[in-house]
């Protein structure tokens, strides 16, 4: 199975045969045609006003400024577009805003994919309120 993005011998990033500079020069309609089906449908149905506002904010932002003061958003369902590359966005995970630096390989994914909302639970030893059978731990 071939990858949709590659780095060539020179180390230049390509997404479906287009370099990053070409992608950033394209219109939204041209980029939409390259995206996977789910993201393409999201954009073709029309971005919400919040998503449009985020897109404009990220497009106009300076990459050096966003490194220190990231753009904060709750929009986990926003597809990552080429204009987002090299910017830092703080995505809300349900508890706090966590920084995500957008790399070229992230194009075509959703913002929420890079900030998990759940953590894996590692259970410790049985506590005071545990049942009698679960308290028993043989001494070694």
From Swiss-Prot:
Question: Superkingdom, according to UniProt?
Answer: Archaea
- What is one cellular component GO term in this UniProt entry? cytosolic small ribosomal subunit
Q: Which SUPFAM superfamilies match?
A: Ribosomal protein S19
UniProt entry keywords in alphabetical sequence:
Ribonucleoprotein, Ribosomal protein, RNA-binding, rRNA-binding
Query: Matching InterPro entries, A to Z?
Result: Ribosomal_uS19, Ribosomal_uS19_CS, Ribosomal_uS19_euk/arc, Ribosomal_uS19_SF
Where is the sequence biased in composition, kind Basic and acidic residues? 52-63
Its Gene Ontology molecular function terms?
Answer: rRNA binding; structural constituent of ribosome
Record-level GO BP terms: ribosomal small subunit assembly; translation
Pfam family name, one = Ribosomal_S19
Annotated stretches, region: Disordered: 43-71
Q: What does this protein do?
A: Protein S19 forms a complex with S13 that binds strongly to the 16S ribosomal RNA.
Q: Which family does it belong to?
A: Belongs to the universal ribosomal protein uS19 family.
Classification via HAMAP family: Ribosomal_uS19
Q: Please report the name of this protein according to its UniProt entry.
A: Small ribosomal subunit protein uS19
Lineage here is: Archaea, Methanobacteriati, Methanobacteriota, Stenosarchaea group, Halobacteria
Gene name tied to this protein: rps19
């Amino acid at each position: 199975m071939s990858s949709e993005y590659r780095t060539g011998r020179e180390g230049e990033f390509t997404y479906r045969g287009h370099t990053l500079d070409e992608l950033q020069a394209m219109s939204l309609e041209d980029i939409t045609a390259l995206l996977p089906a789910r993201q393409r449908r999201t954009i073709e149905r029309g971005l919400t006003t919040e998503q449009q506002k985020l897109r404009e904010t990220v497009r106009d932002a300076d990459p050096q400024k966003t490194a220190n003061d990231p753009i904060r958003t709750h929009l986990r369902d926003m597809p990552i577009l080429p204009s987002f590359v090299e910017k830092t966005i703080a995505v809300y995970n349900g508890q706090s805003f966590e920084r995500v630096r957008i790399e070229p390989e992230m194009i075509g994914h959703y913002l929420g994919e890079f900030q998990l909302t759940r953590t894996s639970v590692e259970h410790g030893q049985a506590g005071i309120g545990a049942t009698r059978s679960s308290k028993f731990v043989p001494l070694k």
